[in-house]
Design a protein with these regions (language model features):
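Extracytoplasmic beta-rich repeat domains
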Residues: 1-8, 31-50, 72-95, 116-144, ...
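Fold-core signature of tandem repeat domains
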Residues: 13, 22-25, 53-54, 65, ...
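Structural signature of WD-repeat beta-propellers
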Residues: 17-18, 50, 57-58, 102-103, ...
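WD40 beta-propeller blade core
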Residues: 23, 63, 108, 117, ...
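Short loop/turn segments that connect beta-strands within beta-propeller blades
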Residues: 26-30, 66-70, 111-115, 159-162, ...
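Extended non-catalytic domains of envelope/secretory-pathway proteins
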Residues: 98, 139-150, 157, 236
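C-terminal closing repeat unit and adjoining cap/tail of repeat-based domains
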Residues: 162, 236, 241-289
Length: 289
């Protein structure tokens, strides 16, 4: 099955797939800007810096790509993993660094200017730290001077400049958490929406999504819902469900609104101005105004 990851900058969509193709498309003109075949399946999200497109392959090799022509500028080899699970390499960046969490469980901070490693730390809790050990995490989050990593079974909050652990909390999330700046929001396997203070690691609130949805709709039977993704827009939480519904929740954990999307989510939605952009489960681009 073909799997796509994409990122948008200005009017260009950059796409990487699990076959090894990397390409740029002008979505306004609907024309291909460039296309390259790197012949290794890509296995990460994409990030953009001033001149570079960053992506990692299935062997945990991190690429710096010229975003204007698709040519490789530099790569970073990291630990390979023989066995694969559902975890993809995760990239995040700020103005000065790219942060790379690979499928071995190692988190790297790489300085963008000179493309050198600033620090790295391994978060794999397996007793067998070998290329056969499996590590799972949600995509990493950068929040000011912190890095948030939601792995199985721990939530880590680390100092961005040093990699030192500030918070280590025994909780795992079935989706990528989201940070408001002071709080991190996640969803557990029991469909609990949990809010955790990023400085203290204490739980601010925990609500049962199924029960609260039933209460909001005024139904007696408890709903059986499954969360897919979560976002923050205009200081409100948007909880996207696998059944194509979206629940809008305020920062105190109260449901405000429930709506239905016209097509199922295939990728994490991107919010651009007043529009929501995502790929559906058939890899078709959906733009909602």
């Amino acid at each position: 099955e073909k799997k796509l990851n994409f990122i948008i900058e200005n009017k260009i969509i950059y796409v990487a797939d699990n076959i090894g193709y990397l390409y740029a498309i002008n979505y306004l003109d609907k024309k291909i800007v460039w296309a390259k075949n790197y012949k290794k399946p890509f296995r990460s999200n994409l990030k953009i810096t001033q001149d570079d497109l960053l992506v990692a392959d299935q062997d945990n090799l991190l690429y710096f790509i010229n975003k204007y022509n698709g040519n490789k500028k530099k790569n970073f080899p990291t630990e390979e993993v023989i066995l694969k699970n559902n975890f993809y390499n995760s990239l995040a960046n700020d103005d000065n660094n790219i942060f790379f969490l690979n499928t071995f469980g190692s988190l790297y901070s790489i300085i963008l200017k000179d493309k050198k490693i600033q620090w790295f730390v391994n978060l794999n809790q397996s007793l067998d730290l070998s290329t056969n050990s499996l590590f799972y995490s949600n995509p990493i989050i950068i929040n000011k001077n912190k890095i948030i990593v939601s792995s199985n079974p721990y939530l880590y909050i680390l100092e961005k400049n040093s990699g030192l652990t500030k918070v280590k909390f025994l909780i795992d999330s079935i989706i990528k958490p989201i940070s408001s700046g002071q709080k991190v929001f996640l969803v557990t396997k029991d469909q609990l929406l949990v809010c955790i203070d990023e400085d203290s690691g204490k739980v601010d609130f925990s609500i049962d999504i199924n029960q609260e949805t039933s209460n909001f709709l005024g139904t007696k039977n408890k709903k059986t819902l499954k969360a897919k993704m979560i976002s923050i827009v205009n200081d409100e939480l948007y909880l996207f469900l696998k059944n194509s519904y979206v629940i809008k929740v305020n920062m105190g954990g109260k449901i405000q609104q429930i709506d239905k999307l016209p097509a199922k989510l295939g990728t994490f939605p991107i919010f651009i101005n007043n529009s929501i952009v995502y790929l559906n489960n058939k890899n078709r681009l959906i733009i909602l105004d």
